[in-house]
Amino acid sequence: KKKNMVIKMAENMKKIDKALYSKAVSIARNASLTVEEKTGRHPTRFEVETTVAFVCFYLEKCDIVVLETGLGGRDDATNVITTEILHIFMPISIDHSESLGDSLQDIARIKSGIIKNSAPTVICYRGDFNNEEDSPESIIINKCKEKGSKVYKVSRELIDNIKVTDSHLEFDILKNKSLSLDNTHLRLSMKGAYQPANALTAYMALKVLSESGFPVSDENIKTAFEKTKVAFRFEIVELGDSVDIILDGAHNPDGAKKFVDSLNLNYEGRDKIYITGIFKDNNNIIF
């Protein structure tokens, strides 16, 4: 189990040192026992894992931590952090309804709970609401106003000229004066149809950080996008003889749709065979 956990935890894409992990686990264990003694409740596995990660970040003196919530945001274990320098929201979709709610608006309310200070906020819009006041993003924006957080709104309207090659997906980010964006061409090693929106959001976030004094150049950004790969995000395994296996972790209706969009973008007109495994509580996914 310890070996598996060491593999699971990484710093700068490298497996963390076993001695560092052992020290972090020892600190987290003592803290967990103290919590149990004071409250009568032992922290959950995710809470303990989050504590271990935070201790590792502290011991390694990390400059920046990209911290993704485990479930929702407001009540998530990761939300104990109060020193955010940037908030980032991807398009909101229905997921974990039993905990987060049945509507996009309900989920947005819980997710917006990560906004606890005036650090800037980058939001990637869904773009499928006729009335912006009804959109889940409007709930996040209201939270930003409450906390004095400057909002940077990006959407697919800023994306143009998407092209797929054998090895990359390329697209243009259009110039936008209000966001201080210039015309920019990016090449991605990941070829999912949703990756341009992901990259646009990350690009905007990096530009905001660079304006805040973090040394991030356009050259660094472009190189990072060209080299970045994430397993099981429309991961293509080539077997030869025109046969490819696609590995993807889509686990909600929106993710399933984006997976099919990615297939159509990369394999239009090709025969396809689907092998799908779904948990019982995610039986609302339809391919």
Each model region followed by its residue ranges:
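Glycine-rich helix-loop-beta junction characteristic of Rossmann-like nucleotide cofactor-binding loops
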Residues: 56, 113, 265-267
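Short clusters of hydrophobic/aromatic residues that line enzyme substrate/ligand-binding pockets
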Residues: 9, 75, 99, 115, ...
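Residues that form generic nucleotide/phosphate-binding pockets
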Residues: 24-27, 31, 143, 224, ...
